[in-house]
Amino acid sequence: MSKNLVVIESPNKVKTLQKYLPNDFEIVSTIGHIREMVHKNFGFNEADYSPVWEDWTKSKKKFSSLSFKGNLKGKKLLSKYDIIKSIKEKASKATNIYLATDPDREGEAISWHVYDVLDEKDKSKCQRITFNEITKNAVLDALKNPREIDQSWVQSQFARQILDRMIGFRLSRLLNNYLSAKSAGRVQSVALRFLEEREQEIRSFVPRFWWTLDVLLNPKAEGVREACANRSIPIVLREINPALRAGLKFEEEKSVSGIDFLDEASAKKFGEQLKGVFEVYNIDETKHYSSSPNSAYTTASLQKDAINKLGWSSKKVTLIAQHLYEGVSINGEQTALISYPRTDSTRLSAQFQQSCKEYILNHYGEKYLSNRIVSAKGKKGEKIIQDAHEAIHPTDINITPEMVKNAIKKDEFLLYRLIWIRTVASLMADCKKSHTHIRFINDGNKFYASSKSLVFDGYRKIYEHFENKESNDLYIDLDKIRVGDRFMAKDIKITARQTHPAARYTQASLIEALEKSNIGRPSTYNTMASVNLDRGYASLNKHAFHVTQLGEQVNEELSKHFGKIINKEFTKNMEKSLDEIAENKKNYQEFLRDFWSNFKEEVKLAEGSIQRVKKEKEFVGRDCPSCASPLLYRYTKRGNEKFVGCSNFPNCKYNEFSQNKPNLTLEKLEELCPECNSQLVKRRTKFNPNKTFVGCSNFPRCRYIKKDNAS
């Protein structure tokens, strides 16, 4: 019999964690949440706004006991009943019970649920422990410093769940009845509003057109020493001679760049007047400036970088980061490579900073060391850092990306390298640069060139070292130029320019925008960007969000009737209230009571005024071959594919896209998708039915294809 029982969430952690625990410790996994709120009455008691939990003894629905990775073959299917029963049996035999679920509010709530279902005699054995990384020191230190379950954190999680039910269930029912839309939600609907506002901004944008004139000087000029590194010198028009302005249409944009011609003819006319030499009449005083490295990753900044640099989806970033945290196989041994990946903190512990600085000192020298101390504050100290986590960082800075490159999967390596480099760079010295303006004159017309030099590479050194690429900055060294040097024009270039609307949101930029508005939490960033795709409210085209017609209708009605709730400020304040509940500054039941009483009235008003959208039937002009009823055009549930169906549906289920499209799925496999945990299937290719491949059954939501398997 094991004297000590450790309860965790994910079975993926078991092997990694077992390495650091004595033999008399047994680990059991909850495999996520063990209880959910009932669906009746939105899952809470309206008398006191406490959650009502389902009866776990009746929870018999089976699911895989498997983790996110691996093969289904030979694995037992479990229900929540099976899991809770097993935990209770093991708890009754243990001397000590350590509740070691994830170190956030959701993990705190799961620990409370485990505690709540235990027999009274076993509850006294329970202690709560947390660790931000699965390393020997972190785990053993947690065991030495157990605590009680934080009821404020638990209540904050209860409030979030009930709040999401209140808003999501009522609004979803309303949308489904009047718009045939799938759902609405506290955060997803605000994200949709972001997308729609950007869509309207793009549609209403009126571009401004202008022309610029740039001159390229020949570096091989008389009196110029060593030909200025033998490169042509680009100069920008800054001021036009008053005597030459007649007939020219232009604007002076001195605060930006220089002269903007309002038509091409004016630019050409001026260009034809440029004759003779361009002489240096002044060199401005050199300005020195520095650029500091970015802080170590938060969940949001990791999402943004991985989506942009690796081309991944938000869901994939979340999944691979979880693998690295829970432990990956390195030479047959499970090793956790990064700290907890759901955090909005940029803090690094003093101990970790010291080990990282020792690495920098040993590999790059003292001049590359930063003297900054990374504090627990967020960006500019504006944001409350949830639960005082650390930033995402490697568990051991001495495990470099190159050391594990051939031992772990490619995707795991790519994300680990991103995290490792960013962490080390955050503690390196600033990059130092210099900037000088060189002034030229030609027939009273004034131009300037910018001389940029890299003085000290600082933190950029590590990016060049590990990513094998230089900075994107273009450095032009014109130090050899002196006042009085004379040049001839090599080329005069006239360029048509125009302003452009703001770019459509990508998954990365939407997460960044929501995070800057203090909307959502690290655990929800993954779904915030994707849920509107799943509901058919938006589509992705070349990685950019486009709002569908259904999405526009949903946003319009929500903004019209629930504008006080579905907006940035309300959602931001709601997150703040949840933080205050977690800090024991606000009572969660009073908070919910105040919200619910007002929200119910708004729903009643909306039900009396919202317009039911009637979709005009679009008939094909021929009858159904199965039942002779008229055929009409329909749309799939997600609203993104048109097909021909019978008007007598559901009595007649004839449709033509299933008639015209062959069944591409051949068989389901006993293997899970490594990206979304759905079952893999064997399929025929679309254009060659004789060729097969293995892909995800969750297509098109997940587009994973197993490589090297086509036949």
UniProtKB/Swiss-Prot annotation:
The active site is at Y340. Keywords: DNA-binding, Isomerase, Magnesium, Metal-binding, Repeat, Topoisomerase, Zinc, Zinc-finger. The keyword Transferase does not apply. Gene3D superfamilies: 3.40.50.140, Bacterial Topoisomerase I, domain 1, Topoisomerase I, domain 2, Topoisomerase I, domain 3, Topoisomerase I, domain 4. GO terms for molecular function: DNA binding; DNA topoisomerase type I (single strand cut, ATP-independent) activity; zinc ion binding. Pfam families: Topoisom_bac, Toprim, Zn_ribbon_Top1. GO terms for biological process: DNA topological change. Coiled coil: none annotated. Residues 3-134 form the Toprim domain. Residues 183-188 are annotated as: Interaction with DNA. It comes from the Bacteria. A zinc finger (C4-type) spans 624-652, 673-702. One of its GO terms (cellular component) is chromosome. It catalyses: ATP-independent breakage of single-stranded DNA, followed by passage and rejoining. Residues 150-604 form the Topo IA-type catalytic domain. Its EC number is 5.6.2.1. Mg(2+) binds at E9, D102. Releases the supercoiling and torsional tension of DNA, which is introduced during the DNA replication and transcription, by transiently cleaving and rejoining one strand of the DNA duplex. Introduces a single-strand break via transesterification at a target site in duplex DNA. The scissile phosphodiester is attacked by the catalytic tyrosine of the enzyme, resulting in the formation of a DNA-(5'-phosphotyrosyl)-enzyme intermediate and the expulsion of a 3'-OH DNA strand. The free DNA strand then undergoes passage around the unbroken strand, thus removing DNA supercoils. PANTHER family: DNA TOPOISOMERASE, DNA TOPOISOMERASE, TYPE IA, CORE. HAMAP family: Topoisom_1_prok. This is DNA topoisomerase 1.
